[in-house]
Amino acid sequence: MKLTDHGVFLCGGVPKQTAPLTPDEGRRRTMAYRILQAHNQSGDERQLRIRFDAMLSHDITYVGIIQQARASGMKEFPLPYALTNCHNSLCAVGGTINEDDHVFGLSAAKKYGGIYVPANQSVIHSYAREQMAACGAMILGSDSHTRYGALGTMAVGEGGPELAKQLLRHTWDAPLPEVVLVYVTGTPRRGVGPHDAAIALVKATFASSFVKNRVLEFAGPGIAKLPIDFRNGIDVMTTETTCLSSIWETDEETKRFFEVHGRPEAYKKLSPEDGAYYDRMIELDLSQLEPMIALPFHPSNAYTIRDFLANAQELLAGVEAEAKKRWPKANVHLLDKIHDGGVWADQGIIAGCAGGMFDNIDEAAQILRGGSVGSGYFSMSVYPTSVPVSLALTRLGVTESLLETGAIIKPSFCGPCFGAGDVPSNNGLSLRHTTRNFPNREGSKPGEGQFAGVCLMDARSIAATARNGGRITPADELDYTPERHPYQFDKTVYARRVYNGFGHPQPETKLIMGPNITDWPRMYELGEHLLLELAAVIHDPVTTTDELIPSGETSSYRSNPLRLAEFTLSRRVPDYVPRAKEIAAKEAERREGSNPSDILAALSRVGDAEALLNTTQFGSCVFANKPGDGSAREQAASCQKVLGGLANICYEFATKRYRSNCINWGMLPFTLDAGTPFDYAPGDLVFVPDVRKRLEKGCEDFPAEVLRQTGEKAELLLHVKGLTPDERDILLDGCLMNYYAKRG
């Protein structure tokens, strides 16, 4: 894979350094530009204000989104909005609370005119592909893996407040992104699947932020040779590159997809116009790809399986060392997986929006046919991505074949991807064709001494491994001839079970709210000055949203902001919640007119404490080098806010969506200049004078003072760059809900 970090033109279907066009003229010839401008309401091509064609949320986000929109005056859903139930669908934690969310979702779909997909019918992104994607369309989802570029749809994953804005008939605002050409050539060899291509792409781009907040535009002769499931499998993983969105050329294969799904009108031919200009380029030669493995704790920590097996001792020792550093309570050992001439896994999982597609499961079954998973410690589970896919596999005999080998077929459920299904054993090594292998995302609890490792692999190599009883094996080492079967979609599945009320709201319908569904607590506007106490200081290279607010069983409480907030940073900084609560209690005392001695003492170090007390807002703050990689979950920010969080300080944000979440929840997204030392500790204070006035004026620099617990003081220059006028007002008002409430 070759990366080019300067502009290129696509002329006659071939990348070139020059063309008889200016770059600005060429930019207007990309697919991405044309789709974005078709949805842009601003009148300014460089400052987008996008209205989407449709939206989707699953059952750990839609309750909070609807609650935000209700509180801001929403009366009906103004665009198709699908509510899927693919995360807390086991209903195994918290008594009735998970099914209570589902009942709320159906009542909301009826009241406001939405689409309700019952539990286990489909994972969110499969339903979007099957029923909502269309060439030239744009879809917004409250899940980071909202990616339907291979179907000609530009899709964006964002936190819940951005969806609430659309429900209130407002726009998604962003500067015009740069576009990166992914020029695809070659044909994958036997045994190489979409996850191999995707993992290789993430490895090549993530660490350098090569495509961060940019759009990936896939073109080139190699696309025509890829089945649509293969394309979708690469596309959904582009999220892990930190790109903003994606779009692919469409062709006869795309057309067949829409015809099979009974939506031929959704197809149209998309391709870059001759002379299209791209800010960067990635050359992806499919013929050079090998079966890949991504080791803990990130999809970019990737190697060819062959290289991994040749260097397993060294590589697993490195994973062990990192795990022991992160979780000293856990008795981590992975090196014992190396024995009997191989590396042995304990579990194989094919699941979710990346793994559970028809072609992946079909070819995995072909590899396993006539073999056995065995009767040892290794187990294998397969989760088809939707009931229509499961039904097609059953009718073809694939389900029967897999069951005969000892694999288990499970429902359409996202659990293995976020820690709510098939949690491995302590010190277990799980191979997964899912999207992520972040720390603890598989469900282990390091605070209780638990550890498990997840490696990402393609379904084909997982099947090859299963055939060998758990000995990690690349699929291209097996002698088999894959046979591609046509997919038959049965539209009656959704016709019988999915409630589609778009355009037909029933305002008289009463929302059904279980006891766990609560309103958001009161949030206050920004003070004249800020006094921030560091409640967590994290120096890891990247901090994921899974660390900021764990998934798995904690997701069951996402309809209850205060209850969920109890889990904030619980697996990374266990002291954060009690520390943040203590800070919030002091701020509550200040608001009630008391004079907390700690706050007075701190303010006396920067000025007249009595004069500053009534105008200085006191709250907690998290420092992390690069926070927000991973999920779109707004709760990574809202839980900090609920606990009294007022800011994040970092060198850069890992993703736009996490920064947007911070802004929408009224937390100042402060950044530091690269190289600025930050050797402060929890309990140290940061005083930001005149923060409100400077924000109102549009200032981007915020001089601050750090008050160490040792009595020392230090100057610190903070930045808040690139805010839109609306974002400034949201921060001033304290959060998005306050912003809308203030404006009626």
Question: Where do the PLM segments sit?
Answer:
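Fe-S-dependent hydro-lyases/dehydratases of central metabolism
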Residues: 1-744
